[in-house]
Amino acid sequence: MLWKNQEPDIKILKDYEIINDIGFKAGVHSLQSNDKVTLVMTKNCWKQMMNHIEPHKVEMGGLVVGKVYKRKTPDEFICLFLKAIPAIDKDSSPVSLLMGTEVWNHANKNSLENEVVVGWFHSHPNLGAFFSGTDRMNQQANFSSQFHIGIVIDHIRDEYAVFYGKDSIQIDNKNVIVIEE
């Protein structure tokens, strides 16, 4: 057998590279966090999620495309949410969401260089922003890398919560930074 080195599918960038992607002021702000995980999200990505979720009283969701930046240690990172990819092929109710596989194809087609699926979003209309047991199983099965982030939004109660990694560890909302493009 011949061993051949191959670049990984997902490129983890160095933390200072975020300045090139989001500008000096926002980049420095994101680098100043002392917490393990910081989520930086463009206003446009937030709007894309909300435009998909708000008209509905059933669970809606999709994938998020962005970039990942490594910090000091392997379990410290900054995740940049750039684009929300709504799941159009889905089956949903007020308390459940089953996304079809087409959303993955759509996400891959809409990813630029160094952009990958970094997580997912979904709504809990008027149920509160929390990760249910099903959400935790989905995170562990489909978004198990340390940098994968799940965001749940209750647009009726105006709440959101953010979780990362296979163990669905909650990120304090103070570590979520929304930026202009």
PLM regions: where:
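Conserved beta-strand-loop surface patch within small alpha/beta domains used
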Residues: 1-117, 126-181
